[in-house]
Amino acid sequence: MPIETPSTSLASAPPSRRLALKTFASLASVAAIGGLALAGCSREDGSKSAAAGGPAVVKKTGDKVAFKYPNNPSFDLIYLADELGYFEGTNTRPEYVGKIAAPQIIPLVGTGEIDFGSRMVPLVISAIASGADLKVVAAGGKTLQEAPHMKYFVRKDSGIRNPKDLEGKTIGFNSFGACAEFVTKKYLRQHDVDVTKINFVVIPDEQAEQTLVTGNTDLAIIHAPFSGRADNAESLVRLWSDFDLDGGLGGMAPYSAHGQFIRQHPEAVRDVVAALAKAGNWVNANTEEARKLVAKRINMDLKNVDRYAYVDDLVVTEPPIQYYIDILQSEGKLAAGKVAVKDVYTNEFNPFAQQQAAKS
């Protein structure tokens, strides 16, 4: 699947963005090499690199603050905010650093090798518990019945129709330690499934459908936008969505920032959060147009691109965070009292949250 690089972004960028992208071109090309190398590293390798060199120094281009961000093929508000011009009129711009594997995003935010990243709440909680310097600064996607965060697929001829049928089978998801693992295991245990009898393997979302079709997995958990392609595959059937499993409580995918960047560039963080919130609200109001933009970005047939929904104004609320603190404690992954909800997030940089607070 073609992946948009900084150079292709420059070629296709609207005139209002082209000059800024040219300005960052040299930085982005160098950073892309580093980002791709880091994507293949283990969590331990990333930690060692950061320990040896310290947090990455924040780069500036002219009077613009450049924040380092992955250039992944996905439905992401940073790319949409950039495309929609929501960084125009600010002193802040994204500096895309190449594709970074999903499991590496939060570890690299925690070390400062990238400045922002979007991954699920349990990964952020675990990183904070281990001493990483990061914080959630904006909410992200939300699960609706008509717009789930993730969907569960099997082959039509698999004979798998209920949770108990999964014992002895192989489940593919995009990473351990996140929503796909913990929401699924919680649900399966509620239905008396012995999860130790299930083989869990990591498969990137963009490869999950094909891996299931070819029989290398028995159930695939796939996130939007790629889940739409599996919905349209003739040989597959959808069993559930995460809305069926927990009513959507575990579906918030927030945006986190490195602590050093927050402390050094609070105005840039406000710029980013405001742009994200505007983009999220735009997606909620323009779902079909958003799908078209993402289809173009990831080079996928529009009919196969699943829609997204976002938390209004991207204001972070506490229940989704407490939900995962409780799960991590029950899984033995987090000591009681090690991380409190308030340790995980802040709405300080969200102008919409400040407006809500002023009204109340």
Task: Pin down the residues of each PLM region.
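Short, solvent-exposed loop/beta-turn-alpha elements that line the ligand-binding surface or hinge
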Residues: 89, 141-145, 244-248, 313-318, ...
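Secondary-structure end/capping motifs
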Residues: 263-336
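N-terminal secretory signal peptides
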Residues: 1-19, 26-36
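Conserved C-terminal helix/tail region of periplasmic/extracytoplasmic solute-binding proteins
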Residues: 329-360
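Pocket-lining segment of extracytoplasmic ligand-binding domains
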Residues: 122, 201, 206-293
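Short, glycine-/small- and polar/acidic-enriched structural segments
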Residues: 48-191, 202, 218, 238-240, ...
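Bacterial lipoprotein signal-peptidase II cleavage site
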Residues: 38-51
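Short helix-loop capping/hinge motifs at secondary-structure junctions, enriched
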Residues: 157-164, 194, 260-269
